[in-house]
Structures are given as C-alpha cells and as structure tokens.
Amino acid sequence: LFYLLRHGERSDFWRVCLCLFAGMTIALSCYVLLPTGLALRPYRVYGSDIFARLVRMLYAVDSSKNVCPSIHVLNTVTLMIGYRRGRRWMRPAANVLGVAIILSTMLLKQHSCIDVVLGAALAFALDAAASSLERSGEMRRVPQRL
C-alpha cells in the first residue's frame, strides 16, 4: 500500500484504499451479524523447534473466531489487484507473496477454504464496484494530493 502511495498513481492508491476500507467494514459487519468460528486446530502442537514455538505463539494470540470472510485474504487479493495496475516488475512479486500469504492462512489453520473463497470473492466484487464508480465519474472527486 505504501508503494502505491509513494510510486503509483494517486487514483490507484485511493481505489485500493476504498476497497480495503469497504471490505473490512463489510467483513466486520458479517462478524457482528453472524459470528463464525473454526475447530481445525490441533489440541496440542508437538515439538520444541522454533517453528512449533511460533505456531503455539500464533495460536495463543489469534483466536479462531470471526473467520468468514477472511480479512487476510480480502486485503491480500485487493492489494494483488491494485499492483496488477502498477509497474510490470511488481506484478510477479505481488502475486507470489499474495499466494504465499493466502496459503499460510490455510496451512496454519487460521481459515478454511470457504473463508478464503468468500474473502477473495468479496475483494473481486469490491473491485468491480470501484470500476463501476470510476466509469460513472464518481471517483474524479478523489483528491490528487494527500
């Protein structure tokens, strides 16, 4: 996001911000109206290596409640879409990093496949809505400077 602010077009930055803010607001509204949770995590994480310790620490601070749609995936896919409009060299790096983030949320049992699909669908729907706003001229009132 900071890359878009510093080096990208201002309209791309504001478009990504609009999608991020609207998406997180919609997701939080879903959590209030229909709380969700997962029981995917193991009862105990065995091992004394650094990775087992990190997973235990993650499980201690991040509960498996309010998971659908996934805000992790929503934000990641929104930024991947935003970087798609940017510089050409940034696209592969953003895609690889984005896929790694999405896979890590599932492999660490923070989200299920349904959470991931709904988070990505929300990101694409908000991008389509932002495109519609852009075509209608509503986005022209966006400030060009911060």
Regions found by a protein language model. Name each.
Residues 4-7, 108:
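Residues in soluble alpha-helical coiled-coils and helical-bundle/repeat scaffolds
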Residues 41-45, 63-68, 100-128:
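Interfacial helix-loop-helix junctions of multi-pass membrane proteins
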Residues 14, 89-94, 112-116:
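Short, aromatic-rich membrane-interface segments at the entry and exit
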Residues 6-90, 102, 133-146:
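Membrane-interface loops
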Residues 92, 117, 121-141:
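Hydrophobic alpha-helical segments of polytopic membrane proteins
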Residues 1, 21, 78-79, 95-98, ...:
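Residues within membrane-spanning alpha-helices of integral membrane proteins
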Residues 84, 91-94, 110, 128-130:
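Solvent-exposed, well-ordered amphipathic alpha-helical segments
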